[in-house]
């Protein structure tokens, strides 16, 4: 794996409406992409609590809520409301219609 590499993961047209996620892969890493309030966010697609896919959750007030266990994960920094555990977040760039994530 090439750390700090930018990888194209999706097109803007593939994103769901605000608050819903999609699952993508970047160099073998599962990533949940969310569009929220005009920005694209990328979070590792694993809930820090029980390991369920965050891409199946919904976003409310800047946090993805895991659809399996109800944990809240901040899209900006990966912090969790209930514990000190964190989800990994990835920098995102939108280049034209393409979404790129730095891993």
Model segments located where?
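Short, glycine/charged-enriched secondary-structure capping and boundary segments
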Residues: 61-62, 81
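Flexible, gly/pro- and Lys/Arg-enriched active-site loops
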Residues: 80-86
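Short cysteine clusters
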Residues: 47, 66-69
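N-terminal pre-ligand scaffold of iron-sulfur
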Residues: 1-61, 75, 88-103
């Amino acid at each position: 794996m090439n750390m700090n590499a930018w990888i194209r993961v999706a097109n803007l047209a593939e994103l769901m409406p605000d608050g819903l996620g999609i699952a993508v892969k970047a160099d073998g890493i599962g990533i949940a992409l969310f569009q929220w309030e005009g920005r694209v966010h990328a979070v590792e697609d694993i809930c820090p609590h029980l390991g369920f896919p965050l891409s199946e959750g919904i976003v409310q007030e800047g946090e993805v809520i895991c659809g399996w266990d109800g944990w809240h994960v901040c899209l900006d920094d990966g912090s969790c409301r209930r514990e000190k555990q964190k989800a990994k977040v990835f920098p995102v760039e939108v280049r034209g219609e393409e979404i790129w994530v730095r891993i």
